[in-house]
Swiss-Prot record:
Its main location: membrane. In MsbA the ATP-binding domain (NBD) and the transmembrane domain (TMD) are fused. It comes from Salmonella typhimurium (strain LT2 / SGSC1412 / ATCC 700720). GO terms for biological process: transmembrane transport. Residues 28-310 form the ABC transmembrane type-1 domain. CDD domains: ABC_6TM_MsbA_like, ABCC_MsbA. ATP binds at residues 376-383. The keyword Lipoprotein does not apply. This is ATP-dependent lipid A-core flippase. The chain crosses the membrane at residues 16-36, 64-84, 153-173, 253-273, 275-295. It is found in: Cell inner membrane. Signal peptide: none annotated. The keyword Transport applies.
Amino acid sequence: MHNDKDLSTWQTFRRLWPTIAPFKAGLIVAGIALILNAASDTFMLSLLKPLLDDGFGKTDRSVLLWMPLVVIGLMILRGITSYISSYCISWVSGKVVMTMRRRLFGHMMGMPVAFFDKQSTGTLLSRITYDSEQVASSSSGALITVVREGASIIGLFIMMFYYSWQLSIILVVLAPIVSIAIRVVSKRFRSISKNMQNTMGQVTTSAEQMLKGHKEVLIFGGQEVETKRFDKVSNKMRLQGMKMVSASSISDPIIQLIASLALAFVLYAASFPSVMDSLTAGTITVVFSSMIALMRPLKSLTNVNAQFQRGMAACQTLFAILDSEQEKDEGKRVIDRATGDLEFRNVTFTYPGREVPALRNINLKIPAGKTVALVGRSGSGKSTIASLITRFYDIDEGHILMDGHDLREYTLASLRNQVALVSQNVHLFNDTVANNIAYARTEEYSREQIEEAARMAYAMDFINKMDNGLDTIIGENGVLLSGGQRQRIAIARALLRDSPILILDEATSALDTESERAIQAALDELQKNRTSLVIAHRLSTIEQADEIVVVEDGIIVERGTHSELLAQHGVYAQLHKMQFGQ
């Protein structure tokens, strides 16, 4: 992810504006309603002059007759405009949140695997949920305050200047002083807000780890460790919030003090005979009341800066993700079905952020329809080889060919359509069994095809025992299934996909011996006429492979058939002896 660029608030908002612009009709309606709302308040104050000078001054008693009707009308107008503005702003805010979340979700789906290796799931979830909400809610709340309070200030100033420009001119001095005060605290607000976004990600990550690993926490007695971890990040979040409150609380009294000094000076100036001669009781009441009324919008405008800076800080974290480079998909070649010839030529690969290569000078040919097994100790590079075929990572040196063409010549969609993957880490979705088997292509397959795939994977036995059979919801990541059942659903998914290239990465590791024997027949059938790359820990499952390749520290050290490798008395023979106790 790129570093958060310290963009100015204006630059950040300009970049956000194209997301808001399609919904500007709602903003315009809300703006008009807010201005009318502020105007009704200002006009209400202006009624004090005729009420005092004419009504209670007994020069025009009719004022007391029409005044109640005007007040009722103004309150009705105020209520209507308040509803319209709130509704329109909420509508725009909801649309912006939805748009930002969709952009983030779509962009993240196009990110390379290396991106997710470096980012915690909790932080990314926080970006999609919390930060995107902050952008819209803070910005919309700030907009309401700026328009309504800004209109109030302008209206009050106009009215004050109309009734007594001599007294009102004093308040003009306030503007630059208030502006300086707001600018001073702006940077502080934005800095704290950025820290709050990051801390919220840590809170989400800590909670997510506990929820996902709840069984491990219980079995290993990790309650105290997880509690301390969560207490630490939640307290950090609290401290950041207190810093924000502190900065906001300091700015409020400063602005109010400046305004009160100006107000005191106005009262003093009003006592001058030259000024008093031109003032009536109604006029001085209107001007003085307007000055007091200015306190609220001035305070709100000071607070809105913190709110707006919080939204812009969240916006910058989202733009940092949106600026991250997605998977390179520069290939043009599109095929319906590959023959399945695979070849690694002098391939070297290093994981991003590491210095030592995970694979070095790998040369490997897998003819179409043949089965090649990769064996070796944990961390030797077996799964890395498999992940390069699907271009989850791009190699540093060399070439990987499919049907004689470099993998980078194919579009990613076309390439990955040729590969079915069953790994030891099966991910299932909170959906029906049938939809998990036919994942992403439910419309392409008939019910009979889905059932046949499940039957071939020896999954129908336990599926039929479920309340709703294939239509049973299996919970998040198949929480309602055993490890072996989840694995068989994944194998059924691969059987249904019917791709020419098959990768089995410890595909039977979660199965008991009896289930493994049962499903091995289905896997043998699945591997017929397909290019198969089998990564196995149990050597008994790969003895019939056309070729067995032994990987050690990222290098191919042995290759041959099962019997040939045993005869060499090398690494494979040692692994075989360790497993079978010979």
